[in-house]
UniProtKB/Swiss-Prot annotation:
The keyword Secreted applies. Glycosylated; deglycosylation largely abrogates the complement inhibitory effect. This is Salivary lectin pathway inhibitor. Nymph salivary gland (at protein level). Saliva (at protein level). Not detected in midgut. Its main location: secreted. Immunization of mice against the protein reduces B.burgdorferi loads in mouse tissues after infection and acquisition of parasites from Borrelia-infected hosts by ticks. Glycans are attached at residues 26, 87. One of its GO terms (cellular component) is extracellular region. Residues 1-21 form the signal peptide. One of its GO terms (molecular function) is toxin activity. It comes from Ixodes scapularis (Black-legged tick).
Length: 91
């Protein structure tokens, strides 16, 4: 394989990897993560052969498996529904 063919293959692979990664970035909820509890999610990184951790954007709807619902803020799910957990005003 000559230099031109090798370059073409590498450029094609880089384009494919960037197209796949485009669906998995901070603030963008991939369809595969619609049922994920909390505000973080993982996407496979083919270049490093490992999982990259991302976070939903601020204001994105989130939930807990116990039925609690909230909004993401700085990577954490802040409940907006009563979860029957004591808070400061309950003491």
């Amino acid at each position: 394989m000559g230099l031109t063919e090798t370059t073409l293959v590498l450029v094609s692979l880089a384009f494919f990897a960037s197209a796949v990664a485009h669906n998995c970035q901070n603030g963008t909820r991939p369809a595969s993560e619609e049922k994920r509890e909390g505000c973080d999610y993982y996407c496979w990184n083919a270049e490093t052969n490992s999982w990259d951790k991302f976070f939903f954007g601020n204001g994105e709807r989130c939930f807990y498996n116990d039925g609690g619902e909230g909004l993401c803020q700085n990577g954490e799910c802040h409940l907006t529904t009563d979860s029957s957990v004591p808070n400061d005003s309950d003491v």
